[in-house]
Amino acid sequence: MSMDTANNDQGTDLGKVIDISRIIQMIPHRYPFLMVDRVVQVVANESAVGIKNVTINEPFFQGHFPSRPVFPGVLIIESMAQTAAVLVVETLGESAEGKLVYFMSVENCRFRKPVGPGDQLMIHVFKERSRGNVWKFRGEAKVDGVLVAEATYAAMILDEK
């Protein structure tokens, strides 16, 4: 059985890969603000692992910083939030239609190492809890297995209109 079709006892796809064409159906973000290129693992209602490929073609590198390009830390956090939004949509299924995931708060944010062009961010998000339409997550971003950023954050799921 391939990883794409492996299921656990609850029917959750453990090895499900969500490519960019599906991501743009799931969340409203677009270039230049789409900060997740692929989701390589989703365990509905639990966790997800996303990828952000950092390239020199990102528009913010013109000013952050021209002599030493550094991926802005706030965009690492945004990558975590967008990966969490994919997890929310995957968890809610059809009931997510007509809903948006709004970023609410960030706590305990730490940036450990700079990220630059050529790096691949592995974004690990873990659902800590949900109460009603408010979900809380813990996120970690790694490059080559090394922790570069971490945070806890919350989101609210509301009707789109």
From Swiss-Prot:
Gene3D superfamilies: Hotdog Thioesterase
Protein name per UniProt: 3-hydroxyacyl-[acyl-carrier-protein] dehydratase FabZ
GO annotation (BP), single: fatty acid biosynthetic process
Catalytic activity: a (3R)-hydroxyacyl-[ACP] = a (2E)-enoyl-[ACP] + H2O
UniProt entry keywords in alphabetical sequence: Cytoplasm, Lipid A biosynthesis, Lipid biosynthesis, Lipid metabolism, Lyase
MF terms in GO: (3R)-hydroxyacyl-[acyl-carrier-protein] dehydratase activity
PANTHER family in UniProt: 3-HYDROXYACYL-[ACYL-CARRIER-PROTEIN] DEHYDRATASE (PTHR30272:SF1)
Predominant place of localization: cytoplasm
Statement: the UniProt record of this protein carries the keyword Lipid biosynthesis: yes
Enzyme Commission no: 4.2.1.59
Gene coding for it: fabZ
Subcellular location as annotated: Cytoplasm
Active-site residues, Swiss-Prot/TrEMBL: 64
UniProt function note: Involved in unsaturated fatty acids biosynthesis. Catalyzes the dehydration of short chain beta-hydroxyacyl-ACPs and long chain saturated and unsaturated beta-hydroxyacyl-ACPs.
Family: Belongs to the thioester dehydratase family. FabZ subfamily.
GO cellular component: cytoplasm; membrane
Organism of provenance: Paramagnetospirillum magneticum (strain ATCC 700264 / AMB-1)
